[in-house]
Swiss-Prot record:
The chain crosses the membrane at residues 144-164. It is found in: Endoplasmic reticulum membrane. Keywords: Disulfide bond, Endoplasmic reticulum, Isopeptide bond, Membrane, Signal, Transmembrane, Transmembrane helix, Ubl conjugation. TRAP proteins are part of a complex whose function is to bind calcium to the ER membrane and thereby regulate the retention of ER resident proteins. Residues 25-143 are lumenal. This is Translocon-associated protein subunit delta. It comes from Bos taurus (Bovine). The lineage of its organism: Eukaryota, Metazoa, Chordata, Craniata, Vertebrata. InterPro entries: TRAP-delta.
Length: 172
């Protein structure tokens, strides 16, 4: 009886172990969209938000994803809808140069290989991502070259000079 109970417990452990391991996504099809901050006057950092809709040929759903941007890793959150994911990060305005940012997405297996390669100081570019999204950031607008206060003061001084000159010319 004890052997049967231990065999049942072993079978339960094996089944729970199999159910926790996620299946790899085969031939991912993505529909990406993204947003980047364009106005540096009203914000302190440049924000990048990438949203994707993911479908796999083998119909894997709700898989854990991780994103890598320029050597920094970020967790990818799942949306309420099936197959919707989002990742976001922020940079200082000076660090967020205009150009294209490559966001590489990894599943759990390839992400663990990426982290292992980083720990061992190996080349991480040889680890293929599940898919890649290119984010085009046009840069941030820092406001006009001359602030409106300085411009208003300069115009006021010019008007004062013209009025004073006209008064002096009339009295002469």
């Amino acid at each position: 009886m004890a052997a049967l109970a231990s065999l049942g417990a072993l079978a339960l452990l094996l089944l729970s172990g199999l159910s926790c391991c996620s299946e790899a996504c085969v031939e991912p099809q993505i529909t990406p969209s993204y947003y980047t901050t364009s106005d540096a006057v009203i914000s302190t950092e440049t924000v990048f938000i990438v949203e994707i809709s993911l479908t796999c040929k083998n119909r894997v759903q709700n898989m854990a994803l991780y994103a890598d941007v320029s050597g920094k890793q970020f967790p990818v959150t799942r949306g309420q809808d099936v197959g919707r994911y989002q990742v976001s990060w922020s940079l200082d305005h000076k660090s967020a140069h205009a150009g294209t940012y490559e966001v590489r997405f990894f599943d759990e297996e390839s992400y663990s290989l990426l982290r292992k390669a980083q720990r061992n100081n190996e080349d991480v570019s040889v680890i293929p991502p599940l898919f890649t999204v290119s984010v085009d950031h046009r840069g941030t607008w820092n406001g006009p070259w001359v602030s409106t206060e300085v411009l208003a003061a300069a115009i006021g001084l010019v008007i004062y000079y013209l009025a004073f000159s006209a008064k002096s010319h009339i009295q002469a």
